[in-house]
A protein has these predicted regions:
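Membrane-embedded multi-pass helical conduit in multi-pass membrane proteins
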Residues: 264-347
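Short aromatic/hydrophobic "clamp" motif used to bind/position activated sugar donors
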Residues: 101
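Conserved donor NDP-sugar-binding/catalytic core segment of glycosyltransferases
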Residues: 112-145, 220, 224
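A conserved acidic beta->alpha catalytic loop
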Residues: 54-63, 108-109
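Short, acidic, metal-binding catalytic loop of nucleotide-sugar glycosyltransferases
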Residues: 36-47
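Cell-envelope/extracellular polymer assembly enzymes that use nucleotide-activated donors
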Residues: 16-19, 49, 201
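Glycine-rich, basic loop-to-helix element that forms the pyrophosphate-binding segment
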Residues: 80-96, 117, 171, 175
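Catalytic donor/gating beta->alpha subdomain of glycosyltransferases that bind UDP-sugars
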Residues: 138, 191-254
Length: 363
């Protein structure tokens, strides 16, 4: 990380309170380590409260949070009956006492200087929002988990425009950001109709109001990916599906890269139809019916094995040559999600704008 010292003028004033908002549901595996990383945050330039917004967990998540909250007054538990992420974020923002809001994830641990550094960088770059670099980690030592982590961290898996592969600088969206609370309320906080991509939508609305978003390499967080191919497939399908819904709600929040897997799968299907049609075509034209599918397959194999070679060289691990299978799973499930949403004319869900907090745990 960049270690250039800060000047006094880059420090926020008056030791402000930062409210960290953490949306969770059934996160008993991760929640304790996440909270410990937050309780160990550097508070030399700010105070910190941690709002855990639980979406009616059916596992031990709530009990773990209550136990930690009973020992540490900085932790508060809120209940999100609607369960969806944007409701959780808005509940946290609504209940926050801080001048600043930090929106965090439950599968992630944070460097000790994460919040303090993002707060400094927010002021240094006169930004509307700031986050650190997101480092992708496997959630277990299983080789499948390693393959998934490598794929999600590689530009061929998630594109060079993804917040997981971008370099430091101003960006169109950022992971786990800190904002002035007034900046969030200015744009109406998160859109509760968007169960996914609510961060892209918020980022676009902030930029439209003139707020810049900055990604700093002075600090980092570690995101632990789901460890199985089944969970990756489900994640990819839902993401692709919601990209179409998000596009309908706010076209400016989505870019071409969000639809490339859909174009890939559509092209694959068309090429497959052409390939099968070659059976009934005149013999001298059959090659032309088969060539598009063969060309697409060859191009994808070259690209995916090129990415695999890059990963294997970096990690010094030959199992990386299995990543083409993971790339293919990610891209096809994502693309099928896009095409499914188009085929059924997927629409935004209805929503209840009300905020309801059933229980708050304070010690």
């Amino acid at each position: 990380m960049n270690s250039t010292p800060y000047s006094i003028r880059q420090e926020p004033h008056d030791h402000p309170l930062v409210s960290a908002v953490l949306a969770v549901r059934n996160e008993e595996r991760y929640i304790e380590s996440v909270l410990q990383s937050l309780l160990l945050q550097d508070t030399s330039i700010c105070d910190l409260e941690i709002l855990v917004v639980d979406g009616d967990s059916s596992d031990a998540t709530r009990q773990i949070v209550e136990r930690i909250a009973n020992r540490n007054a900085r932790v508060r538990l809120l209940i999100n009956h609607r369960r969806k992420t944007p409701y959780a974020f808005n509940l946290g923002i609504h209940a926050a006492k801080g001048e600043y809001i930090c929106i965090l994830g439950a599968h992630t641990t944070y460097a000790k200087d994460y919040i303090a550094t993002c707060l400094r960088e927010l002021h240094l770059h006169n930004a509307g929002g700031c986050s650190g670099v997101e480092i992708i980690r496997p959630s277990s030592d299983d080789f499948q988990a390693r393959l998934i982590a490598w794929v999600l961290a590689h530009p061929f898996g998630t594109s060079t425009g993804s917040m997981r592969t971008r370099k430091a600088g101003f960006s169109d969206t950022i992971p786990y950001p800190i904002f002035l609370k007034s900046t969030l309320t200015e744009v109406g906080a998160y859109d509760i109709q968007l169960h996914r991509n609510q961060d892209n939508d918020l980022s676009q609305r902030l930029r439209a109001r003139g707020h810049k978003l900055y990604l700093t390499d002075r600090t980092y967080c570690e995101y632990f990916v789901s460890p199985t191919l089944a969970s990756l497939s489900k994640y990819a399908f839902k993401t692709g599906f919601w990209n179409i819904i998000s596009f309908k709600k706010n076209r400016a929040s989505m870019s071409l890269r969000h639809f490339v897997p859909g174009v890939f799968v559509a092209g694959l299907l068309l090429c497959l139809v052409a390939f099968v049609s070659a059976i009934s075509a005149p013999e001298h034209t059959r090659l032309w019916f088969r060539l598009p599918l063969l060309s697409l397959i060859i191009a994808y194999v070259i690209a995916s094995f090129g990415a695999a070679f890059n990963i294997a060289s970096r990690e010094r691990d030959a199992t990386a040559f299995l990543t083409p299978l993971i790339f293919l799973t990610l891209h096809t499930c994502y693309g099928v999600g896009v095409l499914t949403a188009v085929a059924i004319n997927a629409r935004l869900p209805s929503c209840d704008p009300g905020l309801l907090v059933e229980k708050t745990v304070d010690s």
